[in-house]
From Swiss-Prot:
Family to which the UniProt record says this protein belongs: Belongs to the lin-54 family.
Chain span(s) of sequence motif Nuclear localization signal: 269-283
Major subcellular site: nucleus
Domain of life: Eukaryota
Keyword set, alphabetical order: Developmental protein, Metal-binding, Nucleus, Zinc
GO biological process: epidermal cell division; floral organ morphogenesis; guard mother cell cytokinesis; regulation of cell division; regulation of meristem structural organization
Keyword Coiled coil applies: no
Name of the protein in its database record: CRC domain-containing protein TSO1
Gene: TSO1
Amino acid sequence: MDKSQKNPTSQIGTSTPKSKFEDSPVFNYISNLSPIESVKSISTAQTFSSLSFTSPPPVFTSPHVISHRESRFFRCHNSVDRSKHLESLDGSAVKGEVVVPLVEDLNKEASLEDEEETSVETSSELPQIMKFDSQTSEHSDSPCTEDVVIEASSDPPRGDNGSSSEDVTMGLQNMLVVREGNDTPGCGRLISDATELLVFRSPNDSEAFRCLVDKISSSERRFCAGVKSTKRPDINKDIPANGSSNENQPLAVLPTNESVFNLHRGGMRRRCLDFEMPGKRKKDIVDDQQSVCDNNVAGESSSSCVVPGIGLHLNAVAMSAKDSNISVIHGYSISGEIQKSFSGSTTPIQSQDTVQETSDQAENEPVEEVPKALVFPELNLGSLKKKMRKSEQAGEGESCKRCNCKKSKCLKLYCECFAAGVYCIEPCSCIDCFNKPIHEETVLATRKQIESRNPLAFAPKVIRNADSIMEASDDASKTPASARHKRGCNCKKSNCMKKYCECYQGGVGCSMNCRCEGCTNVFGRKDGSLLVIMESKLEENQETYEKRIAKIQHNVEVSKEVEQNPSSDQPSTPLPPYRHLVVHQPFLSKNRLPPTQFFLGTGSSSFRKPNSDLAQSQNEKKPLETVTEDKTEIMPEILLNSPIANIKAISPNSKRVSPPQPGSSESGSILRRRGNGRKLILRSIPAFPSLNPNQ
């Protein structure tokens, strides 16, 4: 694992004396930024107050789902490494490094000699760390720790935005401060000695570094920015000019004028295995972590993120970053657990072009969160399908009611399917059903038998016309006869205002057939329908009464014409016309009167009146009296003034004509008048030629 192929072309010699770098302008600039006075380097061991332990061997080939613990963050002591400065071959540019060691104890400061010695050892190993061997593999699954190296340019960064050295100093100090998080136990176990660090070389590592999924905790954010620097020829040899990265290239290249906010975060692999409950892992990734990334320049697309060695649940999170339009520029492996602590050994991250970032720009940087709905999106699809199925079934149930018959075999009227004239289908939960097409003869025979007893059994409960709704809306108290129930409702407590009321459900008013109590149907009340029916009956009676009166008047006019113009076909005897008049008189008052018959004897002129009294309504008496009075008026005065005693002698057949017996009712007086009129008519016989030649 420790064998590494060193490339002499990529290594930078370390035999250059320190005095040469101390006189350089970059050294002077960095010394002005640092609050620590320069002293000579003394090799001392870097100490950590946290719990250190030897990492166990890598037994597992794939990481386990582990719980994510929040660790303590430490305030970094800003120091400048003045002992190691890299100069290009042509001497055109010099580049310096600001190495940020992390010490847990905030009250103690590491001496300058410790920092310089650590920087010397780290800088000498840079070519080995930056060069990844594509032949080795198998160890890309170990978690890594993150360290920050900020590269400073040889000149003060005043060319782009004109900021002074004091502004840069304040910006660097603000960016190198890592805010403290929640103090939770177990954070010290992530920090070990520098000798325990292992550099793994595999193509997966370079692929992971090429694709960055930058996730940090919502309560623990830090902001890092790079300052403008010049290119180094020996480093840029491995990087193509177009800014793309190869498979074996561990670092991604930032495009021009693109911010490097929170992107300079490298890492070395540490053999730390954490065996804890896997339940909290998903929750921490979804709830606690947020992605702070920069948007790509228009026209550029984010590279596909291939993170090696993560489980299926983390793959869902990694792939969801692409769907949420989060730009991916740098990459590092997030297998194992996401680190929240740092080690003293650092790995510099090189970029082709970097942009100066001030604290104000860092504060205005947008923060994007990973949506929770993107984790396991396939689970929502199944639930949506189930809901759609339920809604479809509910819609079918509402549109058509189905029966639940047990013993009637669906051949009774209370079976909704049978009463509606349809066959039972699948939604019905009936038992031993005969209401099916295979038993059509039985169904038809049963229907015919029920209709023979009740013809309206299968008739619709409500008969509605197009005008019924309009009529009901005009007057709520009136119910159109065309929209009334055939059977009627039987509501007791609902006042005909519920859906189970057949009248209310059909949109019609209650009728006389309804047996409801306290009806308040908005389409028509039961008492209102009674009034309408009574009014309609009165109107019918009035029309019938007028028609009958008109018919009586017409008969009176006809009788007048007969009297004024007697026909020549009548016999010479004066009695037949009057007898004809007397015979037709009962028909003049033929308005539902009990028949009062006048019998004319063959040999005698006697009249017989039945003993039964005549029951006549008051409305029917008046026209009869009017007719009789009019008839007496049209008689000649001679007949009115003639004596009654002569009737006996001059009767046609020499028979006595007995006057009618007076009755107690008014009809008796009417008949008496008729008898008097008849006597007067008989008295006028001498005016005609006598039938008896002897007289």
